């Protein structure tokens, strides 16, 4: 199995953006595909993409199969949130000013291929390193009652604070994390619980949607008893990568990247309005 230290010969390029406008909610997912394409062209690097949002609910593609999907989206909008469907695995998650969204884009061109579980464990290792000065153990297993449940839910004392998703294009892998840093996590859980209650509406579903229990989740500030800001957590990610032997630099959005982004954004716009 490959550990994150095995990759520290790669330069980490950091791209950070904050999404505050509803018409830019798809931008991080477009950038994700741009970065996957870039690592297929130039695999001698990794990319750390930091992309917090405000007042958004990121939906999975399977959420569109809800019997009453349209009215479920309206429950989100009625509470002042904007729904957006992502092109990566998983189900609905909240993305507000207390949630850190980040992606690690990794080349998969070594002799030993990086399996799906191995890729997730690279992110787990990064998060554990980022908070290694705290004594609390960070576990990874599915937390029943959480939203967007999965085998790589990150939790402390049985309460989930982060979840992972993954996307692959050829020889590049993107592992994303949403991490509840601060704010009212119980309110976030109730928002998603209400979304599924309205979306299912007592009807039969082919998909096993989660029965969300808000108290199954908490934010990192509560679990570690420290008032983290998003900026502090981002700095911890940077520091952890340096501790693991990586060199970091700010991503240069060169013309080829910008051209790829424009092409994919134009395509997404046409598909949305088709």
Regions found by a protein language model. Give the residues of each.
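A short beta-turn/loop motif at secondary-structure boundaries
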Residues: 51, 92-94, 144-147, 169
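Contiguous, small/hydrophobic- and glycine-enriched helical/loop subdomains that border
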Residues: 100-102, 106-144
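Short amphipathic alpha-helical segments
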Residues: 27, 31, 68, 115-126, ...
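Long, positively charged amphipathic alpha-helical accessory segments at protein N-termini or as interdomain linkers
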Residues: 134-136, 171-274
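Beta-rich nucleic-acid/ligand-interaction surfaces
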Residues: 140-161, 258
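Generic non-transmembrane alpha-helical segments
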Residues: 71-75, 79, 126-136, 236-244
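N-terminal lobe of the biotin/lipoate ligase/transferase fold
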Residues: 1-113
């Amino acid at each position: 199995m490959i550990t994150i230290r095995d990759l520290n010969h790669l330069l980490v390029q950091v791209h950070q953006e904050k999404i505050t406008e509803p018409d830019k909610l798809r931008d991080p997912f477009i950038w994700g595909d741009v970065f996957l394409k870039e690592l297929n062209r130039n695999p001698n690097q990794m990319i750390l993409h930091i992309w917090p949002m405000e007042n958004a609910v990121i939906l999975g593609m399977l959420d569109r199969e809800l019997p009453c999907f349209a009215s479920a989206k309206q429950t989100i909008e009625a509470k002042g949130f904007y729904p957006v469907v992502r092109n990566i695995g998983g189900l609905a998650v909240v993305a507000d000013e207390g949630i850190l969204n980040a992606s690690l884009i990794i080349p998969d061109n070594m002799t030993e291929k990086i399996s799906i579980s191995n890729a997730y464990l690279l992110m787990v290792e990064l998060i554990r390193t980022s908070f290694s000065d705290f004594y609390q153990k960070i576990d990874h297993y599915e937390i029943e009652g959480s939203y967007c449940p999965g085998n790589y839910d990150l939790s402390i004392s049985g309460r989930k604070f982060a979840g992972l998703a993954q996307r692959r294009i050829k020889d590049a892998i993107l592992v994303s994390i949403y991490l509840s840093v601060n704010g009212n996590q119980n309110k976030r859980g109730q928002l998603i619980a209400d979304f599924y209650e309205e979306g299912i509406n007592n009807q039969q579903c082919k998909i096993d949607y989660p029965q969300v229990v808000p108290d199954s989740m908490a934010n990192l500030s509560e679990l570690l008893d420290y008032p983290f800001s998003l900026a502090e957590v981002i700095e911890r990610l940077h520091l952890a990568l340096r501790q693991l032997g990586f060199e970091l630099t700010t991503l240069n959005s060169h013309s080829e990247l910008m051209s790829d982004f424009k092409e994919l954004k134009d395509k997404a716009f046409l598909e949305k309005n088709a």
